[in-house]
Amino acid sequence: MKSKRRSGCPLSASLDVFGDRWSLLIVRDMMVRGYRTFKEFRTSGEGIATNILADRLEKLEAAGIVETEPDSDGRRVGYRLSEKGIDLAPVLLEVVLWGARHEKTSTPAALLEQMTMNREAFLAETRRRWKDRDLTPMIPRLDMRRRHKNE
């Protein structure tokens, strides 16, 4: 699913792949929560509509970020990050830290400190878990209700 690029700018090309409202949240759920199924993504707490979720999963697969494989029961399709997808780990980490620094979030301070002080270890553990197909959640499910800086 190649689309015409606006320019040769790497940032523009990257945003063409994952610059919408939902794609990085789907990647986050796969990377740190171990989500693999459509149903798991629907219950993430973000409120994504089923048609949008299906579209984003299809686009992420077409872009080579996500791969599909039969689920353990063989009745459904499961999703897994590709090598290209796991390479987004540093991007997600920096976006999380930026958001925590500039917006009111529900992320525990201890977790943010760990991510800040031990960036390389956090990224190495993320990659190891992906390589080993370890699907246990890396971080606890956080309160995903909308929060505003002035609350």
Where are these regions (language model features)?
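Canonical helix-turn-helix DNA-binding module
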Residues: 44-68
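Short, contiguous, well-ordered secondary-structure segments
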Residues: 5, 14, 29, 64-69, ...
